[in-house]
Amino acid sequence: MRCVPVFVILLLLIASTPSVDATQKTKDDMSLASFHDNAKRFLQTLRNTRSCCPEEITCCPWG
């Protein structure tokens, strides 16, 4: 009998939590996956330029 009030309170708390993000996304919002993809791409480019740029300047993407 003591568990019934606790169970009811838990049900009420679960029902009151929003299941979807209530805030509207703006064009400035960027997903975290996109941020990680950009970071990976940047690190890959940096790694590639480090291996080729000391020998040959023309292989660098910026010059």
From Swiss-Prot:
**Where are the Tryptophan amide modifications?**
W62
Q: Name one GO molecular function term.
A: toxin activity
Q: In which tissues is it expressed?
A: Expressed by the venom duct.
* Alphabetized InterPro entries for the sequence: T-conotoxin
Domain of life of the native organism: Eukaryota
Instruction: Give a GO cellular-component term.
Output: extracellular region
Question: How is the protein altered post-translationally, as described in the entry?
Answer: Contains 2 disulfide bonds that can be either 'C1-C3, C2-C4' or 'C1-C4, C2-C3', since these disulfide connectivities have been observed for conotoxins with cysteine framework V (for examples, see AC P0DQQ7 and AC P81755).
**Which keywords has UniProt assigned to this entry?**
Amidation, Disulfide bond, Secreted, Signal, Toxin
Propeptide boundaries: 23-50
Keyword Flavoprotein listed? The answer is: no
Where does the UniProt annotation place the signal sequence? Answer: 1-22
The record's subcellular locations are: Secreted
Q: Which family does it belong to?
A: Belongs to the conotoxin T superfamily.
> According to its record, what is known about the domains?
The cysteine framework is V (CC-CC).
The name this protein carries in UniProt is Conotoxin Pu5.4
